Amino acid sequence: MSDQKKMTYKDAGVDIDAGNRFVQLIKPLVKATSRPEVLTDIGGFGGLFSLHADKYKKPTLVASTDGVGTKLKLAFMMDKHDTVGIDLVAMCVNDIVVQGAEPLFFLDYMATGKLTPEKAQDVVKGISEGCIQAGCALIGGETAEMPGFYGEGEYDLAGFTVGIVDNTSIIDGSGITVGDRLIGLASSGLHSNGYSLARKVLFEHLGLNADSKVEELDLSVGEELLKPTRIYVKTILNLLRDFQIKGMAHITGGGLVENVPRMMPKNCQAIIHKDSWPKPPIFELLRKAGNIEEEEMYRTLNYGIGMVLVVPETEAEEIMVRLSGLKEDAFIIGEIAKSAEEGEPTVTLI
């Protein structure tokens, strides 16, 4: 027994030294996201953030957590890991800005079978870039090395964000009325939803791979599918300084049909004009190649619209001018009407 080799944590598959090296690699990336309210550097037990609540009459915190889903499979296939972090931040911060909240800080969780510091650093590069785009600070995270739990080279991600809004400025859709206009902000592509369907159509049905080129797309299939989710925070906060936005919907899983009603009061319907915005080529490729019914496209994918705003009819054109000045591709895609029958809000596509 005394001659038995002494075991270490590294022998069991957990490399503490690799974890320490990873922390050193990401310190500049974390620092690049800092805000004046951040009180701690990376490496502490918790991230400290000094809330300047005196700027608000009734400060209200808004929180959200999310992941990237099977889009990660594309990152594994292409061995490209520096953009999925943007997706992670986007999925969280876009969900809180729809209530009028400014994102304050972000935390991430990464779990993998074997930690490769340089690969994990690439992931954090994306998270850092996403936080910069959203104006929030990356104040902490967890990187879990879990031998035998994930396939070789694979990992999973989760994110968490907290934002703030004055209680009197919370956007909940309750003020939406008949005649209000719907403005759609263009997506960059699939964003972070519909990847199980996309992989089935493109890789299984068509027999393509990540490096395949098809005439419908300017990029390879993998590059198109890995386009980062758009972060709408700064655009929306800019609008809120000067205009009334009555409701917003982040168009994720469930598409326009399922997400738009989430912001609407009862007895209303959103009339959406299907020909009011151009459909990006990736969606038409999926629809035709997969023989997917149009209705399924609208209730599964964002179909080219990543965010929907409900605004007063009297302000719609001026808001469109502002959006153009912000280099935002935006379209008036519909209006609010009274429901034909009393009950839950609905979407009508015409």
UniProtKB/Swiss-Prot annotation:
Its main location: cytoplasm. InterPro entries: PurM-like_C_dom, PurM-like_C_sf, PurM-like_N, PurM-like_N_sf, PurM_cligase. CDD domains: PurM (cd02196). GO terms for biological process: 'de novo' IMP biosynthetic process; adenine biosynthetic process. Its EC number is 6.3.3.1. One of its GO terms (molecular function) is phosphoribosylformylglycinamidine cyclo-ligase activity. GO terms for cellular component: cytosol. It holds the Pfam family AIRS_C. Keywords: ATP-binding, Cytoplasm, Ligase, Nucleotide-binding, Purine biosynthesis. Pathway: Purine metabolism; IMP biosynthesis via de novo pathway; 5-amino-1-(5-phospho-D-ribosyl)imidazole from N(2)-formyl-N(1)-(5-phospho-D-ribosyl)glycinamide: step 2/2. It is found in: Cytoplasm. Signal peptide: none annotated. It comes from the Bacteria. It catalyses: 2-formamido-N(1)-(5-O-phospho-beta-D-ribosyl)acetamidine + ATP = 5-amino-1-(5-phospho-beta-D-ribosyl)imidazole + ADP + phosphate + H(+). Gene3D superfamilies: PurM-like C-terminal domain (3.90.650.10), PurM-like, N-terminal domain (3.30.1330.10). Belongs to the AIR synthase family. NCBIfam families: purM. This is Phosphoribosylformylglycinamidine cyclo-ligase. The lineage of its organism: Bacteria, Pseudomonadati, Thermodesulfobacteriota, Desulfuromonadia, Desulfuromonadales. The gene is purM.
